[in-house]
Amino acid sequence: MNLGEILSSVKLPRPLAPELAQTEVTGLAYDSRRVTPGVLFFAFPGSKADGREFAADALARGAVAVISESLAPPDLAARWIQVEHGRHALALAARTFFGRPDERLGLTGITGTNGKTTTAYLTDSVLRAAGGVTAMIGTIEYHLAGRVLKAVNTTPESLDLLQIFSDLLRAGGTHVTMEVSSHALALGRVHGLNFHTAVFTNLTRDHLDFHGDMERYFAAKQMLFEGAGGNPPRFAVLNTDDEYSRRLRLHARTERLWYGMTPEADLRPRHIVSSFKGLRFDLQFRKQRFTIESPLIGKINVYNILAACATGFSYGLAPEVVARGIASLKAVPGRFERVDEGQPFVVVVDYAHTDDALRNVIAVARGLNPRRVITLFGCGGDRDRAKRPLMGKAAAEASDFVVLTSDNPRSEDPLTIMNDALVGIRRTDVAHVVEPDREAAIRRAIKEAREGDIVILAGKGHETYQVLKDKTIDFDDRAVAREVLKGYGYHQTQ
């Protein structure tokens, strides 16, 4: 494919020189280290480095041209193509280069603050129950037709995303379910893609260090339902109990499927039974009613299940297929995940890292009628500082005992982060301890537990690392908790 063909959908300020337009392109790259002769290099600013600084290196490695928002340096002008939006150009060029694979796949995008990951796992399970050959892309990992790949971002860069789509098609793939983060929408990583179904879970405070305020955060989420540079989705799956869902602007051609607890919802649960064994309820879908059973714990997961069911219906799946897919998902890593060594109390690990998510996970625990709830949490560094006291207050108001510790401090002083959260805790009279060493904090939380208690280790969930100021270390809340329990003499026997 030549350069002119690859850039045919990209708006250029001036036509390409005929000789340049006819140049054959063998691949695309946004990292100069991946450039080989014949590759087209896209140079745009990243979070840690600016690709424009590596343009000369890319050309020296054999790049056919450089695509950038910036004016061309005089010495590179002959092979420099200026565009209005570098990431949009990459997304559109990659889509052309890989033959528009999104048009040949059932593409579902799931956005919102909480519940994206669980909803994605459930949706993927439903589609596989229908016989689909699927990919799932999200926070924990990427699944590609039975293979598991490490997740770099919740939503990959557009080039990597389209490569996954292309690989899936070659493997006989039919559907992709993906978490679509607000960062990905704002940065154009899904620009130009055609989604069959767009799902909105909810919107609460998060990522304001990036977006600035809630309206900008919401505006980023809105982009998925407007088409994000492609056609608007055929279906929008919306939470009738979330105020931001009701504010979304939708294209007239987009069919709405509402889910929630209110009578006007298209999908509504009846007779919910929640226990340590999971969930069971009757699902009312318009004039149909059938039973849903799931091993997932907690009424908050009813919303995630409803969203996944609605997505299945958007693809025309039968209720019995949808129900089978929901029942077959046994657990989601790091989402109310139990650590069981036969102890007389419950220990769970959960990814909750906002005040709303903390309230939700503690509410799930309360719904299981424990003697006490002991909550361990921390706040991430280099993120929205204003949410820290809100998280402290949420944990303190809903728990019987709180252990405040470090999360991923990144470049910040862990004690400064903890002091911010402590402001919220001290607005209550809850018993609490402060322990900056996360391993020692987990030991303290478990030591506090007695028969009938639930210990929640919140914030890191599935993560197997901790990001410190000058390094990243191996750290898994689940593994640490298991070793602590064994150290106290507990050991699960089969």
From Swiss-Prot:
Keyword field contains Thylakoid: no
Residues that coordinate or bind meso-2,6-diaminopimelate: R383, D407, N408, P409, R410, G459, E463
Cofactors: Mg(2+)
Keywords carried by this UniProt record: ATP-binding, Cell cycle, Cell division, Cell shape, Cell wall biogenesis/degradation, Cytoplasm, Ligase, Magnesium, Nucleotide-binding, Peptidoglycan synthesis
Gene3D superfamilies in the record: Mur ligase, C-terminal domain, Mur-like, catalytic domain, MurE/MurF, N-terminal domain
Domain of life: Bacteria
Keyword Transcription regulation applies: no
Name assigned to this protein: UDP-N-acetylmuramoyl-L-alanyl-D-glutamate--2,6-diaminopimelate ligase
Native source organism of the sequence: Solibacter usitatus (strain Ellin6076)
